[in-house]
Each structure stands twice: as C-alpha cells, then as structure tokens.
Amino acid sequence: GSLHNHTQYSNLRLRDCIIKEKDLIEYAVELGHEVVAITDHEAVCNAVKVEKIYKKIKKDHPDFKVILGNEIYLCRNGLNANNFNREYDRYWHFVLLAKDAIGHKQIREISTRAWRRSYMARGMRRVPTYYQDLIDIIRANPGHVIGTTACLGGALPTQLLKYRQTKNEKRNKKIIAWCEQMEWIFGEGNFYLELQPAANAEQK
C-alpha cells in the first residue's frame, strides 16, 4: 500500500495536487494495494467524503483499507509570526496516520490547534504544530496514531542528508535523540521512518 498521499484538499493553502479522493482510492484498488492513506497538507476536512467513498469500495473489496491521516508542519514550541527566525526555524513535514477513531480525533485536535494559531508569512498561511501539541494529545493517550518522518521536507530526512555529507557525530547524536523522543511520544511500535522510491539522488 501507499501511506503518504495527497488529494485536491492539499490545495487549501497552496497549489499542490489535482488528484480527487475517489480517483486515488480506486487506483490503489486497481494496483492491487491492500491499503491507501490520505495525508493532505494540514487538511482533515475531507474525512466524511472519504468515508462515503470507502464504504462503496468496501462492498466489492472487503479487505481493502483506507487510512485517514494528516501531513502536519512540525515546529518548535511557541513559533509565531513575530519570533520566526529564518536562520533556523522551519515548518518540518511530518505525517500522522490514524489507527482508529480515537486516533482520528487526536489528529483533528492537533489540526484545530494549528489552524487556530495560523498566520500569514511570505505570502502563505502557516499552520504550525508544536512538539508540545503531540505531547499533550498523543503522548497523553498513545497507541492510536502512527507518526512517520515524511519526505525530504521533514526534520529527520534533512538531518540525515546533512549527516551523510558531513559525518558530524554531534548531528548523529541529535538524530538518535530526536527519534527516541518521537518513539516516546507515539509509543513503542508507532513511530516509523518513511522510505520513498524515487529517482532523486538525495532520496536514494
């Protein structure tokens, strides 16, 4: 299956994707996948629509699964329009996947926090999720959401790429500490590294 996918709902803040939910799900079935996840860019508002499509698909493909998720922008605690530092602040990509109804509720709560504190910066609405949000909501009741490291826009892939170039051991220790923190937040067996097949040399 494929666990990191976007639909037209990723266009809420930027032009990103033209795929419709129905087309994505039907194509996953056509390819013989057992599961497909929908992880739009800080957007969970298509959940009801996806559930309706999934119910119809499930009649003919009872073993097929659709996972509801969200690709958040993970930032340091307290980041806002007034204290953003171009030198070191980033809106790191990070994927959340709901394992059950409780997990989807947790993802919605995290998304709500991000949108409530959102702000305009450099021509785009920024929707930061703080590490503290993950601690408050997921760490408080772990086991319902899977976290993955996302693409090269994620904190871990970026740091791994820099480590590969520099072999700096301090950076390596920070990478390990970050992964340990994520496993602590999500719970054992609920934090994963994302791997994407791609021709991009940096992703190999």
Please describe what each predicted stretch is.
Residues 1-204:
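Phosphodiester-processing cores and adjacent nucleic acid-binding clamps
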